[in-house]
A protein has these predicted regions:
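Conserved, structured core segments of small domains
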Residues: 1-100
Length: 100
């Protein structure tokens, strides 16, 4: 039975979206490609940035078979592997309601 998780990607600094350098911008492009591929497979149901006035961060809702799978997905994200200072928070969603 699939399990759903909410994941929050916290950037290394509140101003990251406004002042990322070329290397960070390149890695964010790889990050987007990575999650888009997972969306096309039906694993990432939705993902994207949240425009919080205190600092932009990313969210994702995933559908996986087991909790270990979400850990693997987040640790293999290019921005996490690169060690840029991002942190990840992942929480199970035990009961969801899906629309069409």
């Amino acid at each position: 039975m699939p399990r759903y998780f909410f994941t929050k990607l916290n950037p290394p600094r509140a101003s990251f979206a406004q002042d990322m350098n070329d290397e960070e911008r390149r890695l964010m492009g790889e990050h987007a490609v990575y999650w888009k591929a997972l969306a096309e497979k039906g694993v990432a149901l939705l993902f994207g940035p949240v425009g919080d006035p205190k600092g932009v961060y990313g969210i994702c809702i995933t559908q996986v078979e087991n909790p270990e799978e979400i850990h693997s997905l987040t640790t293999n994200d290019p921005v996490i592997r690169a060690g840029l200072g991002f942190t990840v928070e992942t929480y199970p969603m035990p009961d969801i309601v899906r629309g069409r």
